[in-house]
Amino acid sequence: MKKLIVATLLLGSGTLLSAQKTAKIPAYYKPAKSEMYHKDWIDFNKNGIKDIYEDPAATLDARIENLLQQMTLEEKTCQMVTLYGYKRVLKDALPTPEWKQMLWKDGIGAIDEHLNGFQQWGLPPSDNENVWPASRHAWALNEIQRFFVEDTRLGIPVDFTNEGIRGVESYKATNFPTQLGLGHTWNRELIRQVGLITGREARMLGYTNVYAPILDVGRDQRWGLSLI
């Protein structure tokens, strides 16, 4: 967990999808707390001092220990939580003033499948304006990231996760066969290309962590996902 937290902290700081329609992206606003941003470091905890965990020149282990020493139990707990995104659990597409009173006021480990265009099972696709085009989607995720960096105490960036077992789990992304179908091709190069496309589309949409297919044989009949 220790290395995952700081890896997220570090990472936080050819188009393959169908043709995008031209859409006006909201004006990129100046950071609300511009004094945080320095030439070679970011004052994540807003104390005006370059703490060890904020120093890119410090060793990874030193940064991890320094950050953990500053974290409360609530902040550590929240870094172990994944929050399902818009229309699943999260009700808001973008940050609102109420977020400063919600569970994730202390940060959150990950937000999964946020603004991917899907709602609860059986419901039609979301018509939220931030789902598409991809440039608008990436902008929206950046605005959410800004909340976690600028408006939480330690400024730990959130990880934007998504499924990648048969393409990115996004309404506009390329859909591939399930793991079982891909496995039946016995074509390693084809599977490599599927992974390449999935990665490029996820990156374009702004997702930072994509779950890969299980590279193993499912032998336990109690595990229903082995048939997916």
Where in this protein do the model-derived segments appear?
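Bacterial Sec-dependent N-terminal signal peptides
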Residues: M1-K21
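Glycoside hydrolase catalytic-domain context in secreted enzymes
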Residues: A19-I228
